[in-house]
Amino acid sequence: RKNRDFIVIVDNMMNLELLTVTSALTADPQYLDMARTHANTTIRNHYRPDYSSWHVVNYNGETGEIISKETEQGHADGSAWSRGQAWGLYGFTMMYRQTRDARYLEQAVHIAEFLMDHPALPKDKIPYWDLDAPVTKDTPRDASSACIMASALIELSTFVQDPVLSQRFLTLAEQQLTSLSKAPYRAKAGENANFILKHSTANKPAGTFDTPLVYADYYYIEALLRYKRLLEGRPVVDVRTVVSDHPDRELWISTLDRIARPVVANLAAGTLKKNLPFESLSADPDRRE
C-alpha cells in the first residue's frame, strides 16, 4: 500500500528468540546483532512514556523515517491493545534471558508494572481486549493475552532482584493461571472445538472475538509448565545453544543457515519483495506477488 513501506509490529518481539538461537547454533553474530537492533529500535519507537506500546510503526523502507504509529488491532491508535502489551513483555523478558543486557530487563519490568497496576485490569486478571476500550458487560476479554503475560511473568520473576517485586509478578501470574483454569475460560473436554480455552480476541476491529485461539492454548500450557518447573526448583526455561549430539546436527544447522540467511538478509535490507518474490493465496492484493 502507498506510504506503508516497512510495517513493524510489536508482536515481532517474541520472534527474536529465533535469531538469538540461530547465532548460538551457527556461531554467526549477525543474527544476534539483528535481534538487538530490532529490540533497541522497538524500545525507541514503539513505546510511550507510560510503557504502553503502539501496535504498528510504519517506516519509510528507504530512509527509515517514521511515517505513522498505529494500533490496527486495538481500540484506537493511542490505546493499549492488550496482546501487544503481552507480546512486548514476553519478548523483552526473553531478550534479557538470551543476552543478559540490563536494558531489556528494565524494559520488561516497566511493561510488567504498567500492566500489573493498570486500573482497567479486571479482578480475575484476564484483560479486556484493549486496556483503553470502553467497558460494558459485553466488552470482550482476551484470554490469550493473559496466557502470554503469565508465561512471561513467571520467567521475569526469576530475574528480578527485588524480592517484593518478584513476588508481585509471580502472584499476578498465579492469579491469571487460576482464572484461566476454571469457568468461564477453561472449556470442558470435547467442547469448544477441542480447544482448551475460551474467550480470546484475535482481532476485534475485524470482528474476530470471543473465540478460541491456538496460541492461547500454547502459552497457557507453556505457563503451566514453567510454573511447575519453578515449584520444583528448576530453571523455568532451558537455555540451549546446541541442538544435540546427533550425527546429523551439522546438516540441520547448515540447511537452516542456507534457508534463513537470504531471507533475513533481504528482509533487513528491505529487498525481500524484489529479490525473493512469493506466491500468496491472500485476497489482499498487497500480499500477492
Enumerate the language-model features and the residues they cover.
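Glycan-recognition and catalytic cores of secretory/periplasmic carbohydrate-active enzymes
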Residues: R1-E289
